[in-house]
């Protein structure tokens, strides 16, 4: 792995969430640091599910009712750094203080969330988001997450180079079975349990173009669905403002010098 890729991947973080309120019951997901105190992830990683698998149509509507109940307590959402994370053993480097996501209780076309953290994270990359242009079929992306890749060792960060965007919603792929809403796209290379919320990075620029939402078996190609980040540019702007506010409050309370924030999109 090149030094540039190592730095880029350091910005992909593990997220441990106690969805049932019991700190000993932690669900592992992935996310991306998009400001020193702001993480991008999937909403199903930080909200309690009431259905096992969303059933969606190409308009982004649910065919099996509401998917989510309330949000997890932000203080029970931890962010972990490093290439190998074991949430039952390791200590989080930060906790969430606020969760931002689309309204409603449906994951279809809306499985994205931002976490404002209680402290800035240093020594890792802050990854840019591509908010001004959608992803296109045929593009190459680099999925990164803590599903372990081909070894399927959950908690090990892995990437899949040159994954191809097979389709962009609204569409239904008869070959793979993927049904995509207007804000979703499908890649060919498998994502695994633990990769949820992890980013797909533009192979050329390193910008985040989507986050893992749902998918088929880890061992098969196709039907791996991402939510586009450009479709939620306004939510991203709100999240950056909340992160900046938290930084100012932290500075005022502790009289510390803040880490530089990336420019708001």
Regions found by a protein language model. Give the residues of each.
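Residues within well-ordered beta-strands of beta-sheet-rich folds
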Residues: 14, 38-40, 80, 114-116, ...
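Chymotrypsin/trypsin-fold serine protease catalytic domain
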Residues: 85, 108-188, 222-239
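Short, hydrophobic/aromatic-rich segments at coil-to-beta transitions
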Residues: 7-15, 183-185
């Amino acid at each position: 792995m090149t030094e540039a890729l190592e730095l880029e991947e350091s910005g992909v973080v593990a997220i441990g969430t106690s969805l049932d309120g019991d700190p000993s019951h932690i669900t592992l997901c992935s996310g991306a640091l998009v400001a020193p105190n702001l993480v991008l992830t999937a909403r199903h990683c930080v909200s309690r599910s009431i259905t096992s698998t969303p059933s969606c149509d190409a308009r982004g509507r649910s065919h099996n009712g509401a998917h989510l109940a309330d949000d997890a307590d932000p203080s029970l959402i931890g962010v972990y750094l490093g290439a190998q994370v074991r949430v039952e053993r390791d200590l989080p480097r930060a906790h969430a203080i606020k969760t931002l996501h689309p309204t409603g209780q449906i994951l279809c076309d809306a499985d994205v969330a931002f976490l404002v953290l209680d402290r800035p994270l240093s020594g890792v990359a802050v990854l840019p988001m591509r908010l001004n242009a959608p992803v296109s079929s045929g593009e190459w992306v680099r999925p990164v997450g803590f599903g372990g890749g081909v070894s399927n060792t959950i908690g090990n960060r892995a990437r899949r180079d040159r994954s191809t965007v097979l389709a962009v919603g609204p569409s239904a792929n008869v070959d793979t079975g993927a049904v995509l809403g207007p804000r979703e796209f499908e890649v060919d290379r498998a994502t695994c349990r633990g990769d949820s919320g992890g980013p797909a990075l533009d192979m050329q620029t390193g910008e985040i173009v989507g986050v893992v939402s749902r998918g088929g078996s880890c061992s098969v190609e196709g039907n791996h669905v991402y939510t586009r980040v450009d479709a939620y540019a306004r939510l991203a702007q709100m999240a950056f403002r909340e992160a900046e506010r938290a930084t100012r409050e932290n500075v005022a309370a502790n009289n510390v010098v803040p880490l530089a924030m990336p420019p708001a999109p």
